[in-house]
Every structure is written in structure tokens, then in C-alpha cells.
Design a protein with these regions (language model features):
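N-terminal Sec/SRP start-transfer signal
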Residues: 1-37
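Peri-transmembrane interface segments
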Residues: 16-26, 237, 241-295, 301-304
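Short amphipathic alpha-helices in soluble, non-transmembrane regions
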Residues: 78-85, 128, 244-252
């Protein structure tokens, strides 16, 4: 049983006074060990980082998202959508409307994405885990509409967590030509109040641009009646996401696109995969060089032990 270890020990370390061979052999072995360790650690870090980023998006993005392939908005009506809505795997169905707008607080302005959502948005995502502040997640009441801003947008506008003055929101009127004599007449203006909370996704894409508000506010601001930009879905526990995605895509046809969480953030995860591959490539190259050093060391050891 110990014979292989005895032979390895005998021929790895020389009793002769050939210190150079000993040093080169030790360096080669250490080089392979360190390169292998670095490769394993780096890939583990990238995998963990990918899971962490996916966790951030999981709290904000839905499990499945239905959008139109061409155009910006659509009406989720008709037999096909009724069939999708009646699928037993569907747990939460939420209609959303996203559009660009300009927001102003006192003398500060910024471009933002207004995302109007239905009241069951809290059931769709884990938005509560992203909220900071003494208030609560509320989109509207019988009097006013509320806007939940990203933490970086709060900083840019200087509103603070609980802003007293309303946030002014401007959006160009649809199908209306700009009135050069009175440009302000070409824009819709509405107001959002603070619910006392902000969301922190730790992703600039959301934290620096998004404002969550009610679907009715977004439709009124952008002159839409029943149109939406997406239908967001949460599946019941135990449902197969891939199988349901394919089923919905088959029902709706080629006119619509159904995306899971990874496909919704395809650019982010694609960049992470590229970084992971490049790191793997470099470390594999270093490991290959270390292996050539081992081969050279073995060649010198063979010459050293040839008399044995």
C-alpha cells in the first residue's frame, strides 16, 4: 500500500547534493498547487457573485415577464391571455407600464423610468426586503398617488427619505405636436408624494432611475387607457418555470416574448459569464505553464536518478 508513496518520496527528493534540482522541483510543485487553488477559488467567487447578483434581481424582477416583440405597449386581452391567466401554475398576475419621464424636486431635475404597477406588486416580488425608511410601501390612496424612488435617484434629486413637497413628473403628450409658442402645453404634468420609503437593489440600473407608482397614475401620465408594457407573473410553489414559460410562449405565439429572470437581465449575466471565462482562460494558461515546469523538473530528476 505504501510502496507508491515510498517511490515518490525517494525519487522526488534527492539525497545527493543537487540543491538546484530540489529547489526547482519544489517551485514546480508549489506552482501547480497554487495555480490549481487560484483557479478553484476564482471560479467559486464568480459563482457566488453570480448567485448574489441573481438574488438582488430576484427581489425586484418577476419569475416570468410577457412583453410584445415589436412595439412598446399592448392590451392583455383576448382568448390567448385568458387561457394564460387560467393556467393552474399562475399564482400572481400583475400588469405594468414603464415609460421615461422627467422628474423635478424644487430646483433639481433628473430623467427617470416611471413603472406603474398594480396593488398586488408586493405579492409578485420580495420588494419589502429592499425597502428602507420609516414609512410603508403604498402606491396610492383615495386622494394622492405615491412614488417609491431608488436610493441613488433620491440622492440625485436631494429629496431625502420623506420629502414634504410633491415630486413633479413631466411626460410628453402622445400624438401631439410640440407647441413652439407654449412648449409646456405639450407635456403632461402630475405629482407624486412620498410614502416614506426607498428601495435599494444595489444595481444602478434600478437604484438610479426607477420610480414605482400605481398603474393608474402611469396610464394617466402617458395617455394610455388599458395598454400595458408587460405582464409580470409569479408561479405557484413547485411549478416548473421552464415548462410554464414554454407553455405560455406556445399559447401567445410569436407576437409576444416570455422571459425568465435570467433572460430579463441577459446583458448583466452575459458580461459575468465573459468575465468568468476570461479568468478561467488566464488561470488555465498559468496552470499549463506550471505543468511544463513540472515536466522539466521530472526530466532533471530522471537524469539525476538514472544510476539507480
Amino acid at each position: 500500500m505504501n510502496l507508491p508513496f515510498y517511490i515518490a518520496r525517494r525519487y522526488l527528493f534527492s539525497k545527493k547534493n543537487h540543491n538546484a534540482i530540489k529547489i526547482i522541483s519544489g517551485i514546480s510543485v508549489c506552482g501547480v498547487a497554487l495555480a490549481t487553488l487560484a483557479l478553484v477559488c476564482t471560479l467559486s467567487v464568480f459563482n457566488g457573485f453570480q448567485d448574489m447578483v441573481a438574488g438582488f434581481f430576484t427581489a425586484f424582477d418577476p419569475e416570468l415577464k410577457i412583453t410584445i416583440r415589436e412595439g412598446k405597449v399592448f392590451e392583455p386581452q383576448g382568448a390567448a391571455f385568458q387561457e394564460v391567466r387560467s393556467l393552474p401554475e399562475i399564482g400572481v398576475w400583475t400588469e405594468t407600464l414603464e415609460e421615461n419621464a422627467m422628474v423635478q424636486y424644487k430646483d433639481r431635475q433628473a430623467m427617470a423610468i416611471i413603472k406603474g404597477v398594480e396593488d398586488n406588486f408586493e405579492e409578485l416580488t420580495s420588494i419589502d426586503s429592499l425597502l428602507y425608511g420609516a414609512g410603508e410601501f403604498i402606491l396610492h390612496d383615495s386622494i394622492v398617488d405615491y412614488g417609491v424612488l431608488g436610493v441613488e435617484l433620491i440622492s440625485e434629486l436631494g429629496t431625502g427619505l420623506q420629502f414634504v413637497d410633491p415630486l413633479q413628473v413631466y411626460a410628453p403628450k402622445r400624438n401631439v405636436r410640440v407647441n413652439m409658442a407654449n412648449p409646456s402645453a405639450s407635456f403632461n404634468r402630475d405629482y407624486l408624494f412620498s410614502p416614506g420609503v426607498v428601495f435599494v437593489v444595489n444595481q444602478q440600473k434600478y437604484d438610479a432611475r426607477y420610480i414605482l407608482t400605481s398603474l393608474s397614475f402611469a396610464r394617466n401620465l402617458f395617455n394610455y387607457d388599458t395598454e400595458v408594457s408587460a405582464v409580470e407573473l409569479k408561479l405557484k410553489p413547485g411549478a416548473d418555470v421552464t415548462a410554464v414559460l414554454r407553455k405560455i410562449a406556445r399559447i401567445l405565439g410569436d407576437e409576444f416574448v416570455v422571459l425568465d429572470r435570467y433572460e430579463q437581465q441577459a446583458d448583466v449575466f452575459r458580461i459575468m459569464e465573459i468575465e468568468k471565462f476570461i479568468s478561467y482562460l488566464f488561470l488555465t494558461f498559468i496552470l499549463a505553464i506550471a505543468c511544463f515546469n513540472v515536466i522539466g523538473s521530472l526530466s532533471m530528476l530522471i537524469l539525476d536518478k538514472r544510476e539507480d
